[in-house]
Amino acid sequence: ECTDLQHVWEIDRKGAPEQHPDSYQVHLWNSMEGSTPARRVIDADMAAILYTSGSTGKPKGVVLSHRNIVAGARSVAEYLELTERDRLLCVLPLSFDYGLNQLTTAFLVGASAVLLNHLFPKDVVDAVARHRITGLAAVPPLWIQLAELNWPESVRTHLRYITNSGGAMPREVLQKLRAALPSTQPYLMYGLTEAFRSTYLPPSEIDRRPDSIGKAIPNAEILVVRPDGTPCEPGEPGELVHRG
């Protein structure tokens, strides 16, 4: 009934029908191996296009190279101190740079990534407890809802850190989360789709400067500059410039 179907690739002939309709062509995967010259791939080649309106105000497609994705994963994994023992709960869309970064950092260090298509905020809390999650990333609208829930005390023994990006974390929400999860380290992050993350505020600095975007991620340089390109003074609004 698939009238538009033109090609079918069979990976394994076992269990496949001997006869096929004439409306489409059947190709055997094994017979195709080596028939097409291998294309040389370099780290500057495009790996993904992520769509965002965060940096310009208008939707656009951000082209990311393989090198860009790997570099972003390495930087985030370094300051979060990720290891193969970590278990990350992925609740954000993978089409979102913040969501995709959960997978890439897990792949980089060999950690476990648990995918969750949640309907209610409580589903997230239950999954953290059930899968003994060590790292959870979310955006402010979700954190606002999670801060109102009762977190099982057992979570305190394994939820090592939480991260926020995609907007500023309200102070009262952060206070509620820290009260509910006293042994969990919160990382407040700021970033552009082009760079995955640009800055992060270490947990040790939150009490001293809770409204700061923090410092540059590893292997990157950050400046806040005026229209003429000169560096801004502390507290002076300006344009964020990222290199790395």
Positions of PLM-derived features:
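Short beta-strand->loop structural element characteristic of the AMP-binding/adenylate-forming
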Residues: E1, W9, K60-V63, C90, ...
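ANL superfamily adenylate-forming
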Residues: C2-D43
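Conserved pre-ATP/AMP-binding loop-to-beta segment of ANL
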Residues: M32-Y51, K58, E81-R87
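Conserved S/T- and glycine-rich ATP-binding loop of Class I adenylate-forming
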Residues: M46, T52-S55, L88, L94, ...
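Conserved AMP-binding/adenylation subdomain of ANL enzymes
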Residues: V70-R87, L94-G135, L149
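Gly/Ser/Thr-rich phosphate-binding loop
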Residues: I133-A138, A147-R209, P218-E221, P231
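Conserved beta-loop-beta connector loops within the AMP-binding
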Residues: L223-R243
